[in-house]
Swiss-Prot record:
Highest rank taxon of the organism: Bacteria
Subcellular location(s) of the protein: Cytoplasm
GO cellular component: cytosol
SUPFAM superfamilies with a match to the protein in the record: Nucleotidylyl transferase (SSF52374), Ribosomal protein L25-like (SSF50715)
Organism whose genome encodes this protein: Buchnera aphidicola subsp. Schizaphis graminum (strain Sg)
Chain positions of motif 'KMSKS' region: 269-273
Protein name: Glutamine--tRNA ligase
Main location: cytoplasm
Motif ('HIGH' region): 35-45
Name of encoding gene: glnS
Length: 562
C-alpha cells in the first residue's frame, strides 16, 4: 500500500511534527484512533484513520486502536467487530493489541480521587437540568453549585458511595472544580464521572460509575504514551480541559492535542444521530445502505479501500472547515475502476429486437475484449442471434431529428457486431411496444457503412445469451449541497436516490459470478458499457437472479441533472 503522506507535505501537522523532531531527535511518534463503539465508521472516520496510521508509518512510529468505551448504554460488541474489520479493510494494522478505555478504569478512578484530594473535584447532587441551568451561556456566566464547597473528606466518602452503587442514576456526579465564570463553557466545572447502571461489554457489572469522554480521553492518551493526539475542530475548546486534567494529576507522560477540520461532503450527512433517524424511519436500509457514507455502505456500493484512501489524501488536512465536492469522491473510484473493471454489456429495461433476415438457428460467436486499453485483461465470448435485447431508452417511436439512436427508418450499430435498421414495431393490446422488427446488414461486421454515415453505437444482448438481473442505481440522498446545516434535513431528501431496474446481463459473465459466489467471494467490478460502473451485490444476489449496485456513473452527470 502506498502512503501518500510524506515528510515534505506542506501542511500544518507535518510542520508540528518536524518541529518536535528538531527538539527531540529520539522522539518516537505515537498516534491513536479512538472511536466510540456506538455505531459504524463513515467516510469522515476514514480521514482520521488515514491521518493517524499513515503518520505513524511515515515517521516509523506506532498507531494504537483504542475504543473509547465509557458509555455502556450506547455501545455494542457488533460495533467493535465492525470497526476492526473496516480498519483492516482500509489497509491498516494497529500497534499490538486492541485497547479499551475501560482497561484503565481502576487507574482513572484513582486520578479522580487525586483531584478530590487536591480540592479540585467535588460530588454534586444537582439534577442534569439544574447543572445545565447553573452552567450559564456564552453571554452569561455560570453560578456555583450549592455542593461545590463540600470538604475533601465528604467528597471522598460520597464518591466511594457512588462507586458502590448507593446513589441512583442522576442523583450524583463528580465534577471538576475549575471556574464557573470561564469564557470556555467546557471549563465551567465539567462532569468527570456519572452513574450508569448498565452491563458493560468489557467490564460487565464491575462498575456503575463511568468517566466522561473528556476525563478518560486525555488520561488514556497519556497512559499509552501518545505523543500527538489528533481530533477534529469541534474539540478545540476541550483542549483546555484536556490540558487542565493532565496538569493537575500526577500522570507522568503529557500528551498533546491538535485539531484539524472534520470532513463535510456535499449532499451528505455524517452525523450518527441523523443517520440513525434515517434508519429508524426506514428511509435507508440499515447502516450498510450505499446511500449513506459509512465504510460498509461504500464497500457495498463498490468503493475500494484504495479509492477511499486516495480521496482522503486528495482532500488533505487543514484547519479550515469547508464543503468537499461529492464529485471528488466519485472521481477517485471512477479513476480506479476505469483501469481494472471488466467491460461487458447489460441491458436495463429491455425491449426485444427481431432481425428478420437472420435465420432462426443462426448463432455466431464474437470475441470481445475485457478492456479495450488493457489487453492483458483478456477477452470473453458473446453470441449473436436474430433475437436480441436493447434498452428501451435506445429506441424512439416518434420521429425526433435530434435523436441519434434507433428509430423507424434509421440505423444503429450494435456494439462489436452489425448495423441494423428499424422497419416496424409490434405492440400489445395496451399499446406498449413488445418487439421492433429490424433489418441486419450482414456485410457490416467490423466495416464502415458504404455511401452512408457511420451510425451511433448501442449495446445489446442476445436473448439466448441473457441472464436476468436487477440493477440498483444509487444517487445522492439529498437534493441540497449541505443538508447537515438544515434543522429539517429530512425535507430535502432526493426521491430518486435509489432507482431499481430489471434487465439482463451476459449469461457467461453471470455464470462466472455465480461460481465465485459459491466459493470465497471476491468483489467483482464491471463497466456495463454506456451505463456505468457496477459491482455484484453478494448479499441480495441469488443463483437465478443477480443484483448489481451502481458504484458510479461513467461521467459526472449529477450537476447536469439538478
Amino acid at each position: 500500500m502506498n502512503n501518500k503522506i510524506e515528510k515534505n507535505d506542506n501542511n500544518f501537522i507535518y510542520k508540528i511534527i518536524n518541529e518536535d523532531f528538531k527538539k527531540n531527535k529520539n522522539l518516537l511518534l505515537h498516534t491513536r484512533f479512538p472511536p466510540e463503539p456506538n455505531g459504524y465508521l463513515h467516510i469522515g472516520h476514514a480521514k482520521s484513520i488515514c491521518l493517524n496510521f499513515e503518520l505513524a508509518n511515515v515517521y516509523n512510529g506506532y498507531c494504537n486502536l483504542r475504543f473509547d468505551d465509557t458509555n455502556p448504554v450506547k455501545e455494542n460488541i457488533k460495533y467493535i467487530n465492525s470497526i476492526k474489520n473496516d480498519i483492516k479493510w482500509l489497509g491498516y494494522q494497529w500497534h499490538k493489541k486492541v485497547r479499551y478505555s475501560s482497561e484503565y478504569f481502576p487507574i482513572l478512578y484513582e486520578y479522580a480521587k487525586e483531584l478530590i484530594q487536591k480540592g479540585l473535584a467535588y460530588v454534586d447532587e444537582l439534577t442534569k437540568e439544574e447543572i445545565r441551568e447553573y452552567r450559564g451561556t456564552l453571554s452569561t456566566v455560570g453560578k456555583n453549585s450549592p455542593y461545590r464547597n463540600r470538604s475533601i473528606t465528604e467528597n471522598l466518602k460520597l464518591f466511594e458511595k457512588m462507586k458502590k452503587g448507593e446513589f441512583k442514576e442522576g442523583e450524583a456526579c463528580l465534577r471538576a472544580k475549575i471556574n464557573m465564570s470561564s469564557s470556555f463553557i467546557v471549563m465551567r466545572d465539567p462532569v468527570l464521572y456519572r452513574i450508569i447502571f448498565s452491563t458493560h461489554h468489557q467490564t460487565k457489572k464491575k462498575w456503575c460509575i463511568y468517566p466522561t469522554y473528556d476525563f478518560a480521553h486525555c488520561l488514556s492518551d497519556s497512559i499509552e504514551g501518545i505523543t500527538h493526539s489528533f481530533c477534529t475542530l469541534e474539540f478545540q475548546d476541550n483542549k483546555n480541559l484536556y490540558n487542565w486534567i493532565l496538569k493537575n494529576t500526577s500522570i507522568k507522560h503529557y500528551s498533546k492535542q491538535y485539531e484539524f477540520s472534520r470532513l463535510n461532503l456535499e449532499y451528505s450527512i455524517l452525523s450518527k444521530r441523523k443517520i440513525s433517524i434515517l434508519i429508524e424511519k426506514k428511509i435507508v436500509n440499515g447502516w450498510d445502505d450505499p446511500r449513506i457514507l459509512t465504510i460498509s455502505g461504500l464497500r457495498k456500493k463498490g468503493y475500494t479501500a484504495s479509492s477511499i484512501r486516495d480521496f482522503c489524501h486528495r482532500i488533505g488536512i487543514t484547519k479550515q472547515n469547508n464543503l468537499i465536492e461529492f464529485s471528488m469522491l466519485e472521481y477517485c473510484i471512477r479513476k480506479e475502476l476505469n483501469k481494472k473493471a471488466i467491460r461487458t454489456m447489460a441491458v436495463l429495461e429491455p425491449i426485444k429486437i427481431f432481425l428478420y433476415n437472420i435465420d432462426n438457428d443462426h448463432e455466431e460467436k464474437l470475441i470481445v475484449p475485457n478492456h479495450p486499453k488493457h489487453l492483458h485483461l483478456g477477452t470473453h465470448e458473446i453470441i449473436f442471434t436474430n433475437t436480441i435485447y436493447i434498452e428501451r431508452e435506445d429506441f424512439k417511436e416518434k420521429y425526433d431529428k435530434k435523436y441519434k439512436r434507433l428509430k423507424i427508418g434509421e440505423e444503429v450499430r450494435l456494439r462489436y457486431a452489425y448495423i441494423i435498421k428499424a422497419e416496424k414495431i409490434e405492440k400489445d393490446e395496451s399499446g406498449n411496444i413488445i418487439k421492433i422488427i429490424c433489418f441486419c446488414d450482414i456485410n457490416s461486421l467490423g466495416k464502415k457503412p458504404i455511401n452512408r454515415k457511420n451510425p451511433a453505437v448501442i449495446h445489446w444482448i442476445a436473448v439466448k445469451n441473457s441472464f436476468p438481473a436487477k440493477f440498483k442505481l444509487y444517487n445522492q440522498l439529498f437534493k441540497i449541497k449541505n443538508p447537515d446545516q438544515e434543522k429539517n434535513f429530512l425535507s430535502y431528501l432526493n426521491s430518486n436516490s435509489l432507482i431499481v431496474k430489471n434487465g439482463f446481463v451476459e449469461k457467461k459473465i453471470a455464470q462466472k459470478i455465480i461460481k465465485k459466489m459459491s466459493n470465497n467471494f471476491i468483489k467483482l467490478f464491471f463497466q456495463f458499457e454506456r451505463t456505468g460502473y457496477f459491482c455484484v451485490d453478494e448479499v441480495d444476489s441469488k443463483e437465478n437472479k443477480l443484483v448489481f449496485n451502481r458504484t458510479v456513473s461513467l461521467k459526472d452527470s449529477w450537476n447536469l441533472k439538478k
